[in-house]
Amino acid sequence: MTTSLLTDRYELTMIDAALHSGRGLRPCVFEVFARRLPAGRRFGVVAGQGRLLDALADFRFDEDDLAWLARERVVSETTLEWLADYRFAGSITGYREGEVYVPGSPLLTVTGTFAEAVVLETLVLSTLNYDSAVASAAARMVAASDGRPLAEMGSRRTSEASAVAAARAAHIAGFDASSNLEAGRRWGVPTMGTAAHSFTLLHDSEEDAFRAQVETLGTGTTLLIDTFDVERGVETAVRVAGRELGAVRLDSGDLPSLVREVRAQLDSLGATGTRITVTSDLTEHTIAGLRGAPVDSFGVGTSVVTGSGAPAAGLVYKLVAHQAPEGGDWQPVAKTSPGKVSRGGTKRGERLIDGRGRAVAEHVIIDDTRDGRPDGGARGSGVGSEGEPSIRSLTVPLVTDGEADARWMGPEGVQLARAHCATAVAELPAEAMRLGDGDPALPTVYK
């Protein structure tokens, strides 16, 4: 299956009209950025580049696609002929997956003809907006968990395709595992899961259910103890599995007090090494509220796969420069609508790091395009002496002349993004992790 029709109709009608006007093959630069962060957020985590590069490889119009477009009279015959030969031959630079961003960060720069670049708008935004929303929410949950493991468990709270993308994005942001098996197969995300309440209800007694689970999965399994009565569930779990029981799970109740009671009961029964994991519609706020409680791990569902109240990151894809006819000068272009202003010119990002290794500002460099070559590529980082400020370059090549950089793709790309996200988040000032309203973690400085 191609990915070419995962787009909006107006992308193709723009191409149709632009080819007719003679502007369709004009060299252009498009940029992806966020005008603002969702309410209560201090930073975002960009994710989805690896998935986008995969989708880009399949972005072509096959016979079935073209036949449907012709039948629906979406575009002219001339444009259908152009689409039949479509392969993205341009270049894409941008922030690497897992990088932190703030308003104005030039997350992606797409360079090509107007026609070949504009047709990617919907695919780019639908991928990055969702994945970045999940990764941004997940990063806040990781910070709130105070180093305790988190598992993504939201597959039943979103579409089947989004569930896989969400598991991937959450893992990049620091979640340790997912319940989604396809995310494990396709992206190498560690998977986990044992039993639901239905398994307990299937058996004649809670003890029978626990015994069947332990005999099948071993004493290291996690037993769900709140189907009936939690105190009795703990007692039964330890009696069946012994003091070596791996973990118990709580999915309901007043968690701050309940986990303390369960911890005390487990310890009194000699199961001092048995862990407690909690689920129950957790958010970053409820996780933070359990910081002092004896919780060993968390399972998060609805809130992480829906971006914890911000299901889209608010990213936009705007034309920022085009070349004058016949190889002339490059001209910055910008939108000036109230509330939706954009800045013209090709850009690249740099982060100012102070002498303690903390990020203090986001520098957005507007490159001079008058020489006819927009320069949105990576630059070397300016590393200062120990204890002195330094500059970290944020823009890297993702696609060059139509060829994707394989480093950022597949399970290996996911692990690179995960490692980088941990580093990038650790650079942020402490106030970036506050969950209340406030300014972005870093000021955006245009240069």
Residue spans of the language-model regions?
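A residue-level signal for beta-strand positions that form part of recognition/binding surfaces
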Residues: V29-E31, A89, L150, V316, ...
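Non-catalytic terminal segments and appended small domains
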Residues: M1-A84, A183-R185, M433, D437-G438, ...
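Gly/Ser/Thr/Ala-enriched C-terminal appendages of enzymes
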Residues: M1-R26, G40, L269, T274, ...
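Buried, small/hydrophobic-residue-enriched core segments of structured protein domains
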Residues: M1-R26, R36-P38, L80-A89, G98-T272, ...
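Contiguous mid-protein beta-loop-alpha structural module that forms a pocket-lining wall or clamp
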Residues: T277
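Segments forming glycine/polar-rich beta-alpha architectures that bind adenosine-containing cofactors
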Residues: I92
